[in-house]
Amino acid sequence: MRLIIVSGRSGSGKSTALNVLEDNGFYCIDNLPASLLPDLAQRALLHTELLHPQVAVSIDARNLPSQLQRFPELLQEVRDNHINCDVLYLDADDETLLKRFSETRRRHPLTTDTRSLAEAIGDESQLLGPIADLADLKLDTTSLNLYQLRDTIKLRLLNKPEPGTAFLVESFGFKRGMPVDADLVFDVRCLPNPYWKPELRDHSGLEPEVREYLAAQPDVEEMYQDIVGYLNKWLPRFAASNRSYVTVAIGCTGGHHRSVYLAERIGAALRESLKNVQIRHRDLNS
């Protein structure tokens, strides 16, 4: 059985995440009382023929605060039963959450006559702290639209074929901010920039013209060798520490040329020694 626990602040995309998982064969339970997690695990062990092999549950601020505080011990009970379990935590910045609630006109579950929406959003972070601290994968949805969020969940959760560490090599542009879920960040803005070549400006690091230009630059090759050498040494240590997800972010200015080229090459090199390596280009189409 595979169990995915979905949590996060209201408005961050939990419903979308559950919908994606349901569309891909998961049996989904919304707003499960946290205290029922161990019971769910026991049923999985005792009644394998009755329980769906892929289950996703959401646990959020609608739970009793006392149950949320017990989440670490409840999760440990589940894992003690050798259930393949991942915790996904979704979040966005306060301003974005406020905007989303204003646009949808939905009521936040923690608002009252004496607690404003802004206060409720802040209080929710504290309530969900015990879950956020134990998340295997954190996704910041601040800059993601509905379709990007769906694609990201598919890439990170559904492309993980077996237990073990899933590695993501992600290109990005610093002008749109660093990925908040990155574990390792490499800044490649010091390398020659194809953007300043008029004939290359409108091409990307996936295209032959840019690839040939960058491959001919000694500094680019040296940077590539250094990063791959570092990752080949240290990523297995991440895997040995029972990390479920590790994100390696490669950043240039706009996220179109240098970082894309290097992310592709680095991802391909890592696949020679590591299982489950994915490549994503965050800002390529921005």
UniProtKB/Swiss-Prot annotation:
Keywords: ATP-binding, GTP-binding, Nucleotide-binding. GTP binds at D60, A61, R62, N63. The keyword GTP-binding applies. The keyword ATP-binding applies. ATP binds at G8, R9, S10, G11, S12, G13, K14, S15. Coiled coil: none annotated. Pfam families: PapZ_C (PF22740), RapZ-like_N (PF03668). GO terms for molecular function: ATP binding; GTP binding. InterPro entries: P-loop_NTPase, RapZ-like, RapZ-like_N, RapZ_C. Displays ATPase and GTPase activities. Belongs to the RapZ-like family. This is Nucleotide-binding protein PSPA7_5038. It comes from Pseudomonas paraeruginosa (strain DSM 24068 / PA7).
